[in-house]
């Protein structure tokens, strides 16, 4: 069916009475292309084990017996399992009352801005960082206040605290490890941000399992009215298709989110599948060590080729410098390798994949390094 044959296709978004703050904005969209090597969305490349697949299938089969009923609207059993995982992973004695879950960490962040942002309120982030933060701010009519990082992409805590003191944001986002640069933020630095913030601080720990840095969860009891730590099962847990995000905070934050969450937002199927995935956490997270080793190997290969590699604590690598990032991205795609142009001039981001995928990426990088698309190639 052509566009001309689609009912209503004679108008575009601009013809709709859309909110003014959304006009001219672009939707989130990482390219989804079928190519031999896909290293653009920071997924765990290791597929689930047979034991996990079987457990998910059986759990969903059992849950299907109750599909005619609404699910547990508070997902108590799932939140209990998530709390137990966090205790094992971080050593912080959180309970079910400290944990909330939703359909991916983006829904968690959206609920937080619905409750603590909104018209007349502001959210601050340190860019470049996760591209969904400003999109969620726009969607909730929360003013977005971007503060630039240092030239090496690390968080400038002095500049951050000064900006917080000047702008007085209601919400502050700190991403650790930061996407797309890979830096982690230390506990001492987080304390400075928390001490300076007049409102809440959301520490986005989507990639925490890949980092050796202590989790911000250790600060929840110290900053109960300010700190929220968001996490996801999409990355290290290899559960991107399951769409499960969660947070840990003082119980009062969960009470606040109950005011804005949609009823029965987590399906019985999602809850059952996520609980099954958590039962296999040890096997799944075993791949984290393999990916960390591959991250070191790929980083060294890129550096040996002449690229500038930003140190990373996550499962991705930001590297450059390219004379034209968009053309360099296309050059990788032409070689069957899909990576990500994250909008940082001169740099691209590649997910750490399986060894064979990384080998293909390294070969493509060697070829591209010899062209006019890189600073070193241009000098040659």
From Swiss-Prot:
The modification N6-(pyridoxal phosphate)lysine is found at residue 235. It catalyses: L-histidinol phosphate + 2-oxoglutarate = 3-(imidazol-4-yl)-2-oxopropyl phosphate + L-glutamate. It holds the Pfam family Aminotran_1_2. GO terms for biological process: L-histidine biosynthetic process. The keyword Isomerase does not apply. GO terms for molecular function: histidinol-phosphate transaminase activity; pyridoxal phosphate binding. Its EC number is 2.6.1.9. Its cofactor is pyridoxal 5'-phosphate. InterPro entries: Aminotrans_II_pyridoxalP_BS (IPR001917), Aminotransferase_I/II_large (IPR004839), HisP_aminotrans (IPR005861), PyrdxlP-dep_Trfase (IPR015424), PyrdxlP-dep_Trfase_major (IPR015421), PyrdxlP-dep_Trfase_small (IPR015422). It comes from the Bacteria. Pathway: Amino-acid biosynthesis; L-histidine biosynthesis; L-histidine from 5-phospho-alpha-D-ribose 1-diphosphate: step 7/9. Keywords: Amino-acid biosynthesis, Aminotransferase, Histidine biosynthesis, Pyridoxal phosphate, Transferase. The keyword Transferase applies. SUPFAM superfamilies: PLP-dependent transferases. Belongs to the class-II pyridoxal-phosphate-dependent aminotransferase family. Histidinol-phosphate aminotransferase subfamily. Homodimer. This is Histidinol-phosphate aminotransferase.
């Amino acid at each position: 069916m052509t566009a001309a044959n689609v009912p209503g296709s004679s108008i575009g978004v601009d013809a709709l009475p859309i909110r003014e703050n959304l006009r001219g904005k672009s939707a989130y969209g990482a390219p989804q292309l079928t190519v031999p090597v896909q290293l653009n969305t920071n997924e765990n490349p290791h597929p689930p084990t047979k034991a996990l697949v079987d457990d998910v299938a059986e759990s969903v089969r059992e849950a299907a017996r109750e599909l005619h009923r609404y699910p547990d609207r508070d997902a108590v059993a799932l939140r209990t399992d998530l709390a137990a995982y966090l205790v094992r992973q971080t050593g912080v004695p959180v309970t079910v009352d400290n944990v909330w879950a939703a359909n991916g960490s983006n829904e968690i962040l959206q609920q937080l801005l619905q409750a603590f942002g909104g018209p007349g309120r502001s959210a601050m982030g340190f860019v470049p960082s996760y591209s969904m933060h400003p999109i969620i701010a726009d969607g909730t009519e929360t003013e977005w206040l971007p503060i630039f990082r240092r030239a090496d992409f690390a968080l400038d805590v002095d500049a951050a605290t000064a900006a917080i003191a000047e702008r007085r944001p209601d919400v502050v986002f700190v991403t650790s490890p930061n996407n797309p640069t890979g830096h982690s933020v230390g506990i001492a630095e987080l304390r400075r941000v928390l001490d300076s913030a007049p409102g809440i601080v959301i520490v986005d720990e989507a990639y925490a399992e890949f980092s050796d840095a202590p989790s911000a969860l250790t600060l929840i009891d110290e900053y109960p009215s300010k700190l929220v730590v968001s996490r996801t099962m999409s990355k290290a847990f290899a559960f991107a298709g399951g769409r499960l995000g969660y947070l840990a905070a003082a119980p009062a934050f969960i009470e606040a989110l109950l005011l804005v969450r949609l009823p029965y937002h987590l399906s019985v199927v999602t809850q059952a599948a996520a609980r099954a995935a958590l039962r296999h956490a040890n096997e799944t997270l075993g791949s984290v060590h393999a990916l960390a080793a591959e991250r070191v190997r790929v980083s060294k290969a890129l550096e040996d080729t002449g690229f500038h590699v930003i140190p990373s604590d996550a499962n991705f690598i930001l590297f450059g410098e390219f004379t034209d990032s968009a053309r360099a991205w296309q050059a990788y795609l032409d070689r069957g390798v899909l990576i990500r142009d994250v909008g940082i001039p001169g740099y691209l981001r590649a997910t750490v994949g399986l060894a064979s995928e990384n080998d293909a990426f390294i070969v493509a990088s060697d070829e591209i390094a010899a062209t006019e698309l890189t600073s070193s190639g241009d000098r040659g």
